[in-house]
Amino acid sequence: MTIAAGTDDNRQRSTWIWLIACLGVVAIQILTQHLMGRLWICECGYVKLWEGVVNSSGNSQHISDWYTPSHIIHGFLFYGLGYLLLRGKPLSVRLLLATLIESAWEIAENTPMVINRYRSATISLDYFGDSILNSTMDTLAMAAGFLLASRLPVAVTVTIAIVLELFTGWIIRDNLTLNVLMLVWPLDAVKAWQAGL
């Protein structure tokens, strides 16, 4: 065996270790949400691939919905963050950082404090948190966005993010930018515009 072959084997082994660590983070997210009393799936008792009605009891309960693009964009942003902070580190290490951030958000997002903030500051009056399935799929959507950003030119990634933001903003009058704005600094004008859907 050559030195190069041994180095490749070590690199592959290291990649697998980091990927298993990512899965471990997702497993901890799932367990934590279960211990928080979150429902596994929609209270309706079935699972849908897509929930297209934003103001419904099924929103944030199924595999994907209009907020899935926001989580893909999280992946784009976390890839950029990892590139800036951990430039010399392998992609799998940066993916672990992204997974830790996303999982921490998914847990925080489903606490009573954040759920109540959504209900009071945004148009999400009927929001009662994500199902564990939906939250897990949000984390996987982030990972997909992260991996996509790692393969695409920056200009293409930025273009996709802008298109996703504009499209969801047009269709449901909400997107990642508006969501963050309304959580951090709610504007009555934006809330009134969103309510006009």
Swiss-Prot record:
It is found in: Cell membrane. Pfam families: DUF2585. The chain crosses the membrane at residues 16-36, 66-86, 152-172. One of its GO terms (cellular component) is plasma membrane. Keywords: Cell membrane, Membrane, Transmembrane, Transmembrane helix. InterPro entries: DUF2585. It is a multi-pass membrane protein. The keyword Iron does not apply. Signal peptide: none annotated. Belongs to the UPF0314 family. This is UPF0314 protein NGR_c32320. The lineage of its organism: Bacteria, Pseudomonadati, Pseudomonadota, Alphaproteobacteria, Hyphomicrobiales.
